[in-house]
Amino acid sequence: MQLLTIGINHHTAPVALRERVAFPLEQIKPALVTFKNVFLGPQAPNAPEAAILSTCNRTELYCATDDRAARDAAIRWLSDYHRIPVDELAPHVYALPQSEAVRHAFRVASGLDSMVLGETQILGQMKDAVRTASEAGALGTYLNQLFQRTFAVAKEVRGTTEIGAQSVSMAAAAVRLAQRIFEKVSDQRVLFIGAGEMIELCATHFAAQGPRELVVANRTAERGQRLAERFNGRAMPLSDLPARMQEFDIIVSCTASTLPIIGLGAVERAVKARRHRPIFMVDLAVPRDIEPEVSKLKDVFLYTVDDLGAIVREGNASRQAAVAQAEAIIETRVQNFMQWLDTRSVVPVIRHMHTQADALRRLEVEKAQKMLARGDDPAAVLEALSQALTNKLIHGPTSALNRVNGADRDSLIELMRGFYQHAPRSNDQSGH
């Protein structure tokens, strides 16, 4: 079985492409079924394994397969599933086999590959991805072991390095940008659209600035109300957004919608109603919640996750010593995992050897039983049984020795000597 990771992320693709390749949560289980049955094939010698990790910053397919053409087939599957031409998608895709796939998984879970260096949210997202794959019946020995090791490595990295210390989060970056637009965030009305973890983080940071008003709009009213109450804010129905958008100076959106929920026309009307007072908008969703054309409006300052990346990277530069320490830990753990993987590669061979040897044993025992049944001398039967088993068991090695030449033969001879140098001694020879 070969490990392979196929994906795109914030390093390789802009948000405009990432949002087209993202998997909504409800699509992941059925996607895994097609990925296994159509791409990897139901007739594979070993059952294929797969998991899909889809976040704002990355979409990745982790798989274990016997298919030697897995790389190209995976890219084609991803292209077909999302109806994106291969020529458009392929330049942004990375394909990581074996140890590279292992190293990547360890780095992602440890926060080393995140836009926010050392952030912890990705670890929870990865655990959710593994849970979903398990529920879909898509995991097996190889990926289960990979992800168990991955989570252990992430815990070790975060527990022994300062990789997460003083990190500049996306939420903190959003506040910093708002402070560039408005002299005082405390004078502004802030609207949060959504009620997930990212919005909760943003609300925490903005609430610390003491805004004039804090409002949460969410599709599920009860969840939005709970979040608003935590920050002494108010909740409003998401359906009220078009009519009330002009009330807010700062709008932060991060929902799971597959289509934009804020269109150009609605923002144009809001700007006009505000008499061209500026609106600061942050779209942290992938796919995006706000139509990108909104950024062209004169009095609107629209930022996406990619735009916030520059501010985040400023904070990342100061923690390179922790990065080096984390990378060293990861490299050691990658080598450990590859040793385990190497031992797994011989398991099918050992299993086959046992099966073949047992088939020979049963065949010769059956012959011996027939000989005994017709009254043959038991000692002669045992001798015939042992001779037949000996001849059959050494037939494969002797045939191999006769077939090979040169250096290969010398190596095989040394190998065989090692196998048979500790031949058991008979009872008579041992003196018992």
From Swiss-Prot:
It catalyses: (S)-4-amino-5-oxopentanoate + tRNA(Glu) + NADP(+) = L-glutamyl-tRNA(Glu) + NADPH + H(+). InterPro entries: 4pyrrol_synth_GluRdtase, 4pyrrol_synth_GluRdtase_dimer, 4pyrrol_synth_GluRdtase_N, GluRdtase_CS, GluRdtase_dimer_dom_sf, GluRdtase_N_sf, NAD(P)-bd_dom_sf, Shikm_DH/Glu-tRNA_Rdtase. The active site is at C56 (nucleophile). The record marks H104 as: Important for activity. Pathway: Porphyrin-containing compound metabolism; protoporphyrin-IX biosynthesis; 5-aminolevulinate from L-glutamyl-tRNA(Glu): step 1/2. Belongs to the glutamyl-tRNA reductase family. Keywords: NADP, Oxidoreductase, Porphyrin biosynthesis. NCBIfam families: hemA. It is an enzyme of class 1 (oxidoreductase). PANTHER family: GLUTAMYL-TRNA REDUCTASE. Possesses an unusual extended V-shaped dimeric structure with each monomer consisting of three distinct domains arranged along a curved 'spinal' alpha-helix. The N-terminal catalytic domain specifically recognizes the glutamate moiety of the substrate. The second domain is the NADPH-binding domain, and the third C-terminal domain is responsible for dimerization. Substrate binds at T55, C56, N57, R58, S114, E119, T120, Q121, Q125. GO terms for molecular function: glutamyl-tRNA reductase activity; NADP binding. It comes from the Bacteria. SUPFAM superfamilies: Glutamyl tRNA-reductase catalytic, N-terminal domain (SSF69742), Glutamyl tRNA-reductase dimerization domain (SSF69075), NAD(P)-binding Rossmann-fold domains (SSF51735). Gene3D superfamilies: Glutamyl-tRNA reductase, N-terminal domain (3.30.460.30), NAD(P)-binding Rossmann-like Domain (3.40.50.720). During catalysis, the active site Cys acts as a nucleophile attacking the alpha-carbonyl group of tRNA-bound glutamate with the formation of a thioester intermediate between enzyme and glutamate, and the concomitant release of tRNA(Glu). The thioester intermediate is finally reduced by direct hydride transfer from NADPH, to form the product GSA. Homodimer. One of its GO terms (biological process) is protoporphyrinogen IX biosynthetic process from glutamate. This is Glutamyl-tRNA reductase. The keyword NADP applies. Catalyzes the NADPH-dependent reduction of glutamyl-tRNA(Glu) to glutamate 1-semialdehyde (GSA). NADP(+) binds at G194, A195, G196, E197, M198, I199. Its EC number is 1.2.1.70.
